[in-house]
Amino acid sequence: MPGHPDLELNQPSRDDTADALLKWAGEWGRDWVVVDTHPGATDVVNGALSIAHVVVTQVPLRSSDLDGTEHMVRELADYPVVLIPNFVPPVAPAAEVRRLGRIVDGTPVQVGPLIPAALAVGTRKKRMAITSEDPPAKALQPVAAALRQVAAFVQEYSA
């Protein structure tokens, strides 16, 4: 479920957000409802977090991104968080991989399957999910396979 630019100025309360999401999920009759929120502790984010079965967030293996991830893991350690390393080069940066391990060590936060870097993602013109095409463009096939692995991981995690 995407957000809207007007949402920032007209945010419902945490409880109203949670109630609305639960109501909509029931009306839609779907197994999954994915809520895309923006970073930060807003009422909308906190409402979505309060009812989430799993909180999936991508983590590029870069120093500044890991700084933010470390802060987020401390703040959200009580939530069912799964971190997905994203834009991972063919040879993952060892220091950042070790740091990610240290960030989650001693917390219930899990690290899921990685998504490989693919230049084609950044230059792609189609406005549809990469996994919607069967098969996706050759350059995107490793990314599509990884996204399917993430989906399977999340399904198993929340079962």
Describe every region a protein language model picked out.
Residues 40-63:
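Inter-motif core of Ras-like GTPase G domains
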Residues 28-44:
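Glycine-rich phosphate-binding loop used to anchor ATP phosphates in small-molecule kinases
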Residues 1-31:
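P-loop/Walker-type NTP enzyme "switch/lid" segment
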Residues 12-19, 71-92:
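P-loop/Walker A phosphate-binding loop and immediately adjacent motor/lid segment at beta-alpha junctions
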Residues 134-159:
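Histidine-centered active-site loop/cap adjacent to the catalytic His
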Residues 50, 74-79, 104-105:
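Short, conserved loop/helix-junction motifs that constitute active-site signature segments
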Residues 3, 36, 55-60, 83-87:
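Conserved beta-strand segments of the P-loop GTPase G domain that flank and frequently precede/overlap
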Residues 87-135, 147-149:
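Beta-strand-loop-alpha "switch" segments that mediate conformational coupling across diverse proteins
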